[in-house]
Amino acid sequence: MSIRTLISSRPKLTGFGFWVINHLPFNNSIRKKGNKISGGIMTRCRIRISGKNNRIVLGQGTWLKHCKLTIKGSNCSIFIGADSVIRQGDLYIEDDGGRIVVGNRTAIYGPTHLACIEGKTISIGDDGLVSGNVTVRVGDSHSILNLEGNRINPSQDVQIGNRVWIGNQVTILKGARIPEDTVVATGAIVTKQFSQTGTVLGGNPAKIMKENIRWDKKRL
């Protein structure tokens, strides 16, 4: 019997065990009250929470390994759906009300940085595949002003649909929308909203390179 099968067969016992591990002070720093971590499996992860009333919720069968989860704010949430895998993920929320949502059966492999600020949301749908050295950001972290002193670079949500395959070294910036059944080619920089499904996006800035496609995790 594999470790994962054993864990799945005894969810209450193993869930309690990982709850204890994830709250050990030498592993993690969870300050103030009202913060909750529940579900899933986290191994060799580091958690830093400095606000109040934050939630980290992992679905059944989900496994995070060698990840870093940071929340610097209050009323923030990280939701990972069932049967998903994240390895070497850096999930970062700053300011109040931010949300990072990853769907069911989505795999994130290799160093990936999800940065959420100013109460915005990063959402990744079901059955997705994310390669290494991927960056997703909802904002610029610093202000750009016009000559009247008004800020012109507000943060915006990022939406990634179901069944999206993101290649290596892709950057996805504020306001981007990637619809379902899309492949994002290696090195692409996505800066705007796309609505057409079944395409390959590539280039800087990203544009539609191919149409009427679908993809499969298996080498058929």
Language model features: what each stretch is:
Residues 1-46, 50-55, 59-61, 74, ...:
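Terminal amphipathic alpha-helical/low-complexity segments used for targeting or macromolecular assembly
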Residues 129, 187-188:
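Solvent-exposed alpha-helix faces
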Residues 140, 193-194:
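Nucleotide-sugar donor-binding loop of glycosyltransferases
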Residues 150, 190-191:
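Short secondary-structure boundary/capping segments
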Residues 176-177, 188, 194:
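Short beta-to-alpha loop/turn elements within the nucleotide-binding domains of ABC transporters
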